[in-house]
Regions:
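Eukaryotic N-terminal low-complexity, Ser/Thr- and Lys/Arg-rich leader segments
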Residues: 198-202
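GST-like fold's C-terminal all-alpha helical module
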Residues: 65, 78, 82-188, 194
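Intrinsic low-complexity, intrinsically disordered segments enriched in polar/basic residues
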Residues: 38-40, 191, 195
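GST-like domain detector, emphasizing the conserved glutathione-binding G-site
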Residues: 1-115, 119-123, 137
């Protein structure tokens, strides 16, 4: 994946939590043209298995890892639905929160941050507020959903290396103590991964 947290983070965090040995290969955007032809659908992230099989699509490949290592209940259709529903819903946030990083005009960046901080993220946090009171989002142990939603805390709202919206993100955490507490639990549970990963802005 690129030298970002972004779409590659859930899979990396899950494998580290599961103590699965893996090689993390990151590269800059300048190297993308040489990697692109060899990637599934010419996209990243990509998960390459020992036999050379290459998997694309970040949610699908992370779901595969979750099922393989005990974070996704393939045999329990209802529990699987609750996990999938949270991941799908989170995409409304996850596919927009990174965009200010790449905006060149300050006015555009400010407008995007305002929408995120006042509309997009609060709406999501209101929906999951009760689920964040204690423990994990689905069931009594960390699940696939947490590796996505927990990244909202570690990659953005509490990421000291982020270059935009810091005041807005701090204010959101103050307004949503349930989510802040959940994020702190997620960070503690994944302390080994967070200590080993790159210090990226997003």
């Amino acid at each position: 994946y690129f030298s970002l947290h972004g779409r590659g983070d859930p899979a990396r965090a899950l494998m580290t939590h599961a103590k699965v040995p893996f090689e993390n290969i990151e590269f800059g955007f300048d190297k993308w043209p040489e990697h692109k032809p060899n990637m599934p659908n010419q996209q990243v992230p990509c998960l390459e298995l020992k036999d050379g099989t290459k998997m694309g699509q970040s949610i699908a490949l992370t779901r595969y890892l979750g099922a393989k290592h005990g974070y996704y209940p393939s045999a329990d259709a209802l529990a699987a639905f609750h996990i999938d529903q949270l991941i799908d819903r989170y995409q409304d946030v996850g596919t927009t929160i990174y965009k200010p990083q790449f905006m060149k005009e300050q006015a555009d960046k400010d407008a995007a941050i305002k929408t995120l901080a006042e509309e997009t993220i609060p709406k999501f946090l209101d929906e999951i507020n009760d689920k964040c009171k204690d423990g994990w989002l689905v069931g009594d142990k960390i699940s696939l959903a947490d590796f996505f939603v927990g990244g909202l805390y570690t990659n953005y709202l509490a990421n000291e290396h982020i270059t935009y919206g810091k005041d807005e993100w701090k204010s959101l955490l103050d307004k949503y103590p349930n989510f802040k507490g959940y994020g702190e639990r997620y960070a503690a549970e994944n302390a080994a991964y967070l200590a080993s990963r790159g210090k990226h802005a997003i």
